[in-house]
């Protein structure tokens, strides 16, 4: 049995109150302050994971009890020792690979310092985050009746780690793609590269709102801390995959637009009859986030290496982890928004509201 660990942290108040209901009565700022002095702890033992190849894995969730606000506001050199301490706990439990969740892989140098301080390989899971965002977007577009080969796509944050690799791959599937970022020079370099290697018409823009208005599908991965997409920016029937943390899409889109589908990227179904994460993190049973799935896939494959670290992700990495996911029986299983699954009936309703009569067949991400 292969062993892995995944280090995570609370995203919002209910992540604390789920474990300690008494905290519902306490102001959230107080809870944040108290818990930032609490050392990392093992949350649960993960069992029952079995690949379709017969390989098995077990693992542990280890929590660093800091919220996104604290992680972003605390100096990086003070955050790293907290994550490293959690990593040492993982090593003591026998983990052969360690994954980093949510903001733990965003702060500072995206896992590089943490990996350097540990003896066990570390991955951010961003390769499969990109792969599943692409799969999720193409699947959602098909469910909304959008034919990818005729579609206009926009990638916001196109020059970042996940954004540039998403843009390179998405351009192979669509008619037209608009790359959005703040740095025009880097945008034009990426535009040139994509135009050379695909048949898509490639545009660049530094204005996300105008670029979004003409798009059938949008992948948002900007590191901007403010909201970039408002309800009035989207055309009816559009699909938006918001991979960014903090989010790029305003919560008002969900409240005011019943004719657009906003997803957080794919929910991944993890293989095994009796998969038990031993902890409720807001997903249906046997389902997990892509960065958790990447860590498990690497364990099952016995690829004990720093598969995804830092800010450079190659197309080959995304394609490889997507193939390995398929090999071991992991699949994108529906969609989620604000960490909650979106039921099929809701997707149907949104499609009808957009005036699209039926869904179409999704393209294959990896040929």
Feature roles, as predicted:
Residues 101-110, 118-120, 126, 131-132, ...:
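N-terminal Rossmann-like NAD(P) cofactor-binding subdomain of oxidoreductases
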Residues 142-217:
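Glycine-rich phosphate/diphosphate-binding loop of Rossmann-like nucleotide-binding domains
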Residues 199-275:
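Rossmann-like adenosine-cofactor binding region
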């Amino acid at each position: 049995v292969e062993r892995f660990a995944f280090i995570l942290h609370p995203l919002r108040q209910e992540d604390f109150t789920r474990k300690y209901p008494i905290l519902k009565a306490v102001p959230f700022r107080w809870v944040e302050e108290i818990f930032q002095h609490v050392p990392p702890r093992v949350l649960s033992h993960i069992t029952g994971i079995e690949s379709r190849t017969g390989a098995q894995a077990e693992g542990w969730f280890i929590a660093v009890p800091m919220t996104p606000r604290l992680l972003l506001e605390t100096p990086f050199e003070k955050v790293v020792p907290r994550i490293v301490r959690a990593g040492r706990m993982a090593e003591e439990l026998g983990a052969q690979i360690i994954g980093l969740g949510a903001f733990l892989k965003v702060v500072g140098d995206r896992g590089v310092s943490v990996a350097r301080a540990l003896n066990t390989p570390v991955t951010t899971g961003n390769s499969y985050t990109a792969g599943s965002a692409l799969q999720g977007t193409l699947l959602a577009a098909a469910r909304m009746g959008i034919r990818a080969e005729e579609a206009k796509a926009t990638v916001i944050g196109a020059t970042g780690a996940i954004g540039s690799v998403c843009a390179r791959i998405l351009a192979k599937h669509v008619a037209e793609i608009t790359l959005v970022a703040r740095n025009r020079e880097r945008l034009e370099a990426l535009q040139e590269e994509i135009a050379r290697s695909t048949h898509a018409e490639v545009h660049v823009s530094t204005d996300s709102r105008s670029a979004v208005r003409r798009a059938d599908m949008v992948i948002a991965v900007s590191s901007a801390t403010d909201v970039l997409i408002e309800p009035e920016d989207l055309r009816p029937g559009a699909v938006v995959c918001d991979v960014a943390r903090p989010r790029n899409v305003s919560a008002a889109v969900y409240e005011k637009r019943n004719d657009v589908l906003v997803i957080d990227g794919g929910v991944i179904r993890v293989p095994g009859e009796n998969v038990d994460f031993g902890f409720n993190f807001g997903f249906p049973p046997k389902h997990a986030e892509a960065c958790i799935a990447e860590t498990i896939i690497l364990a099952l494959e016995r690829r004990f290496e720093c598969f995804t670290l830092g800010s450079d992700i190659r197309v080959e990495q995304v394609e490889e982890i997507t193939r390995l996911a398929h090999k071991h029986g992991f699949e994108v299983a529906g969609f989620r928004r604000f960490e909650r699954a979106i039921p099929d009936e809701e997707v149907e309703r949104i499609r009808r509201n957009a005036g699209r009569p039926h869904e179409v067949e999704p393209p294959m991400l990896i040929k």
